[in-house]
C-alpha cells in the first residue's frame, strides 16, 4: 500500500513590493504521508490499534510482539497476514498456543496516540519493565558516526517527500547501514526495525534514530538486546535512567563531529 498521496492545498507566501510585505494565498500540490489505523489481532482477538504508515507491517508485527513481551523469538509466531478492511488494516498474527495463553493473562487495550505503546497501559507498574543487563560485546569507533548520519539523512525517502515521518536505521560496527524503516510514529519505525533485526539473526551493531530518545525507545532497544542507541534529538531523564540501569550505550543530539553520551561510554573509542 502506498505511504504517500498527492493533494492540492492552499498556502501563503509573503512577497515584497515597493511599499510593504504582502501575504498572497496560492495553490500548490503537496505530498502527504498516509497515516492509517492498524489493528494487531492475535489468534482472532484484537489486542492493539496503532496509527502507522501502511508498509512493512509484518516486520512491525514481529517487532511489536517482541518488544511488548508477547513472544521471545520469531518462531513463536506461526504466521502473519496483512488484510485491508474498510477502516484500516488488520494484521492477523497466529501465535503458538503457549504464547497466546500467556497473552490472554496480560491483555490490555492500546488504542490511542500515534505509535505510542505505553498509552493505554492499565497499571503504572506495567510501564517500568526490567530486563537482563546488556553485556558489553563490542567497541565502536566514533569517527564512523559522521558517515552514518549522512546515510540516515539521504535514505529517508518518505521523509524527504513528506517531511512527516521518523526513521530508524541499523548499522554494523563498520558503519555500514544494514536496514532503515520510516513511519509516522517513531515507536512504530523502531518496532519495524527491531522486527527486521530479530528475523535477521540479531546482527551486532547499533540503532540510529531521527527522533528523541524517550523511555520507550530505550526500553524497546534493550528488550531486543541491542547494545547502543543513537538519536538526533535529546534524551529524557527516564530514558537515561533506563539506559544506565541496563548498560545501554545512549547518545543524543548526534551531529557531525559531536554528540551527548548519556550512558555506556565504555563501548566507544576514537
Swiss-Prot record:
Family matches, as Pfam families: FdhD-NarQ
Localization, UniProt: Cytoplasm
UniProt-annotated binding residues for Mo-bis(molybdopterin guanine dinucleotide): 253-258
Active site: 116
Gene Ontology biological-process annotations: Mo-molybdopterin cofactor biosynthetic process
GO molecular function terms noted in the UniProt entry: sulfur carrier activity; sulfurtransferase activity
Alphabetical list of InterPro entries matching this protein: Cytidine_deaminase-like (IPR016193), FdhD (IPR003786)
Major site of localization recorded for this protein: cytoplasm
UniProt keyword list: Cytoplasm, Molybdenum cofactor biosynthesis
GO CC terms of this entry: cytoplasm
Alphabetical list of PANTHER family matching this protein: FORMATE DEHYDROGENASE, SULFUR CARRIER PROTEIN FDHD
Protein purpose: Required for formate dehydrogenase (FDH) activity. Acts as a sulfur carrier protein that transfers sulfur from IscS to the molybdenum cofactor prior to its insertion into FDH.
Family designation: Belongs to the FdhD family.
Protein name: Sulfur carrier protein FdhD
Originating species: Haemophilus influenzae (strain 86-028NP)
Upper lineage: Bacteria, Pseudomonadati, Pseudomonadota, Gammaproteobacteria, Pasteurellales
Gene designation per UniProt: fdhD
Amino acid at each position: 500500500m502506498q505511504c504517500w498521496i498527492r493533494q492540492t492545498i492552499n498556502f501563503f507566501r509573503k512577497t515584497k513590493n515597493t511599499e510593504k510585505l504582502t501575504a498572497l494565498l496560492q495553490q500548490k500540490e503537496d505530498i502527504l504521508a498516509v497515516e492509517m489505523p492498524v489493528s494487531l489481532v492475535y489468534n482472532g482477538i484484537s489486542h492493539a490499534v496503532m496509527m502507522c504508515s501502511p508498509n512493512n507491517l509484518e516486520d512491525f508485527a514481529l517487532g511489536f510482539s517482541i518488544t511488548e513481551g508477547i513472544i521471545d523469538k520469531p518462531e513463536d509466531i506461526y504466521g502473519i497476514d496483512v488484510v485491508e478492511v474498510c477502516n484500516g488494516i488488520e494484521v492477523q498474527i497466529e501465535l503458538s498456543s503457549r504464547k497466546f495463553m500467556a497473552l490472554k493473562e496480560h491483555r490490555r487495550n492500546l488504542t490511542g496516540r500515534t505509535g505510542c505503546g505505553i498509552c493505554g497501559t492499565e497499571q503504572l507498574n506495567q510501564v517500568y519493565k526490567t530486563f537482563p543487563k546488556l553485556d558489553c560485546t563490542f567497541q565502536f569507533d566514533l569517527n564512523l558516526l559522521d558517515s552514518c548520519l549522512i546515510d540516515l539523512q539521504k535514505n529517508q525517502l518518505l521523509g524527504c517527500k513528506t517531511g512527516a515521518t521518523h526513521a530508524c536505521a541499523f548499522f554494523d560496527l563498520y558503519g555500514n547501514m544494514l536496514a532503515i524503516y520510516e513511519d509516522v510514529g517513531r515507536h512504530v519505525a523502531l518496532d519495524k526495525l527491531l522486527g527486521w533485526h530479530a528475523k535477521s539473526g540479531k546482527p551486532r551493531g547499533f540503532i540510529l534514530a531521527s527522533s528523541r530518545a524517550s523511555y520507550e525507545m530505550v526500553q524497546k532497544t534493550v528488550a531486543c538486546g541491542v547494545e547502543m542507541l543513537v538519536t538526533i534529538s535529546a534524551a529524557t531523564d527516564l530514558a537515561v535512567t533506563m539506559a544506565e540501569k541496563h548498560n545501554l550505550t545512549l547518545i543524543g543530539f548526534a551531529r557531525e563531529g559531536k554528540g551527548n553520551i548519556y550512558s555506556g561510554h565504555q563501548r566507544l573509542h576514537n
